[in-house]
Amino acid sequence: MIKVVVVDDSAFMRKALSSMLEKDPGISVVATARNGEEGLEQIRKHDPDVVTLDIEMPRMDGLTALRHIMMEMPRPVLMVSSLTVEGAEATLKAMELGAVDFIPKQLSTVSLDIVKIEKDLQEKVKAISRRRVPGRSFRPAPAVRPAAPAALRATPRPSAAPSSAASSTGTLQVAGGKPVRDVVAIGVSTGGPPAVQKVLSRLPQDFPVGIVIAQHMPAAFTGPFAKRLDGVCAIAVKEAEDGEMLMPGKAYIAPGGKHVRVRNTRGRLTLEVSAEPAEALYKPSANELMESAGLALGRRSLGVILTGMGSDGLEGIKVLKQKGGHALAQSDSTCVVYGMPKAIVDAGLADSVVDIDDMAQAIMNAVYK
């Protein structure tokens, strides 16, 4: 039985979340709390497997409570977030502090979305409960070094704000010669923001190809996510726009609620941003991105699947590999949820399985050979 503590100042939200969770026979809400202080007391008392945590609360807010949880009794935490720019920024900060993921707070609307939210909530709680200490499994490991390297140092752009992420980019090693890839496509879901930041912040400003990322996120979150990454990375990061050219040294985040695809028109690489197909399970979809990269560039495409629930990306990687592309998967031990990477590993499609600390180096290696 998975034990959960629900922390929220709204009586409606406490009841709604508890009701949704306990519809799953494998989940028990052992306590609820009205603010961060009460939440810490209940966590100490019940030692839950998972905590759901509101952000805006009296007496002690969610970010303060989260800091205490991660320092004193680290465990998987799901933030309960409003789908606003402010809510997105606070939630992204929470994930930097150690929260695993978030769930939307707009549960009062009577619609079919409630059924999906309920199922997603239950699945997230069950998946992350297996990771007792979020982020702590990201163990340091020596970077992969190809033979006869030439150093390429990642230095922050002048406009980039100083940060621990930017200052830890270090030196990536690359073999000589020209790149053999023209795009890096990344698919990621639960646990993704810290993983994506770890990878992108270690790439050099003169990274030779464009990077396109399909991160499962609502529309209100992808813009702030791109802006936050742009402030801590040497490469430029922005939200993808329909029709824009794919440029070297730049990463493009697919807008929430839309798909992003790579198009190749006589060697001119552009991005297509569209809500179609409407029936896709995820928007953005890693499948749509990976398939488009493979079809557009064949063996000059690189697909990377990072932490996430489910198997989004599997069908797209199949196409990418059929066209001669290269595929990397994040390792089980460094994933928050080993779902999406597991799908391509189990299918025999991953050329390499890589710890998250080594992923930037692995991407650099694959781009050059």
Swiss-Prot record:
Its EC number is 3.1.1.61, 3.5.1.44. Contains a C-terminal catalytic domain, and an N-terminal region which modulates catalytic activity. Belongs to the CheB family. Residues 136-174 are annotated as: Disordered. Phosphorylated by CheA. Phosphorylation of the N-terminal regulatory domain activates the methylesterase activity. The keyword Zinc-finger does not apply. This is Protein-glutamate methylesterase/protein-glutamine glutaminase 1. One of its GO terms (cellular component) is cytoplasm. The gene is cheB1. The active site is at 189, 216, 312. It is an enzyme of class 3 (hydrolase). Keywords: Chemotaxis, Cytoplasm, Hydrolase, Phosphoprotein. Its main location: cytoplasm.
